[in-house]
A protein has these predicted regions:
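N-terminal Rossmann-like NAD(P)+-binding subdomain of aldehyde/semialdehyde dehydrogenases
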Residues: 1-50, 220
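Rossmann-like NAD(P) dinucleotide-binding subdomain of oxidoreductase/dehydrogenase enzymes
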Residues: 40-181
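Structural motif
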Residues: 57-61, 77-78, 84-87, 117-120, ...
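Short, solvent-exposed amphipathic alpha-helical segments in soluble enzyme
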Residues: 75-79, 103, 158-160, 188, ...
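Short secondary-structure boundary segments
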Residues: 91, 146, 208, 348-351
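Short, surface-exposed amphipathic charged segments that create phosphate/polyanion-binding patches used
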Residues: 134-137, 178, 239-248, 286-289, ...
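Conserved C-terminal structural/oligomerization subdomain of aldehyde/semialdehyde dehydrogenase
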Residues: 264-371
Length: 371
């Protein structure tokens, strides 16, 4: 399935998609297999309260091009566990691999005794048809993973929605951080599947006291720091300022290919493109979410400025999603967590893998990072 996804979408690395598929299946299964989801799930005789769970009904699940098979697998497993039928609507550029993932699950479900048609899929559909399915009176719940426009459309459908939208993830490398460790973890995360995880770091905020060391450590790992002229070349290639979205052509592509698209000469072994920036927002588009091995880089004079920068980055496209910090100072970590508007605050952890859960921490494994 991982190879099929790479062949069809031309995004990411199949070796990393294998890991995503494993998290979506094996890790999720081990996490929820003992959890009762239907019937009496809690009974408190002292308070005389009994909690009863029941299926919600047909689920309409929209899946993305960036994590196609893993998202299909995950949404099907949690739907079957809660006894809800599910209809998958895959991204048009990932329909074959997504349908194959759904077919594998459906055949396994039938062999295990599940009812016919418990898992269905729409191989092709227009935008109008997808909107009609979201608004259908028999749709009980929508699981919408995709762009801001898609998630907003789901919320306008009139049916209950769990929306999984974009993230613009800042990572702060504090003065007390173990810099070589921090850079290694960010490198592992941002190069994972060529940066297609929406929880991957988008902007580094270093402290003035350790900025030079951070730069040196990234260069050891073949990261390429862009000049101002190169940043100006890359911006229109990576981001559409008129539509305020990253360009599909760079999503999940290797750093060397993206540099070539922008007419930037980089060494053949370049792993990341890093853009030193001073501003945040649409006027500085590399500060926004780009699901590729591209990172913005800021230097803060002190902790207070670092917080302001991280809040700005978080605000521009990442509200409710993910933020990350590398620090050994517990008070600073707690303050950072309280200052960010994010569903997940990751500490001393690679954001891509850490946000998915089940590997670097004890967060529940999930391919739906809701915001």
């Amino acid at each position: 399935l991982a190879k099929l996804a790479c062949e069809e979408t031309k995004l990411g690395r199949w070796e990393d998609k294998v890991i995503k598929n494993a998290i979506a299946t094996r890790f999720v299964y081990n996490d929820i297999k003992g959890q009762k989801t239907v019937g009496v799930i809690a009974d408190d005789p002292k308070q005389e309260v009994v909690e009863v769970a029941e299926p919600v009904g047909p689920i309409f699940a929209i899946t993305p091009v960036t994590n196609p098979t893993s998202t299909v697998l995950f949404k099907i497993i949690i739907s079957m566990k809660s006894r809800n039928p599910i209809i998958i609507r895959p991204h048009g550029a990932a329909k074959d691999c997504s349908v194959e993932a759904a077919r594998v699950c459906y055949e396994a479900a039938l062999r295990a005794g599940a009812p016919e048609n418990c898992i269905q899929w729409v191989r092709t559909s227009t935008q109008e048809e997808a909107l009609a399915l979201m608004a259908h009176r028999k749709t009980a719940l929508i699981l919408a993973t995709g762009s801001v426009e898609l998630v907003r459309a789901a919320h306008r459908s009139g049916n209950p929605v769990i929306g999984i939208g974009p993230g613009n993830v800042p990572v702060y490398i504090g003065k007390s951080a173990d810099v070589p460790f921090a850079v290694e973890q960010i490198f592992i995360s941002k190069t994972f599947d060529n940066g297609t995880v929406c929880a991957s770091e988008q902007a580094i905020v270093a402290n003035r006291a350790n900025a030079d060391e951070v730069v040196a450590e990234f260069k050891k790992r073949k990261a390429y720091f862009l000049s101002q002229e190169e940043i100006e070349r890359l911006e229109p290639v990576a981001f559409n300022k008129e539509q305020k979205v990253m360009r599909a052509e760079v999503i999940g592509q290797p750093a060397t290919k993206i540099a070539e698209m922008a007419g930037i000469k980089v060494p053949a072994d370049t792993t990341l493109l890093i853009a030193p920036l001073e501003e945040v927002g649409i006027h500085s588009p590399l500060s926004l979410e780009i699901l590729a091995p591209i990172l913005a880089f800021y230097v803060a004079e002190d902790f207070e400025q670092a917080i302001r920068l991280c809040r700005q980055i978080n605000h521009h496209g990442g509200l409710g999603h993910t933020c990350s910090i590398f620090s050994q100072n517990e008070e600073r970590i707690e303050y950072f967590a309280s200052a960010m508007n994010a569903g997940s605050i990751l500490v001393n952890t690679p954001a891509s893998q850490g946000a998915l859960g089940g590997t670097y921490n004890r967060l529940r494994p999930s391919l739906m990072l809701a915001c």
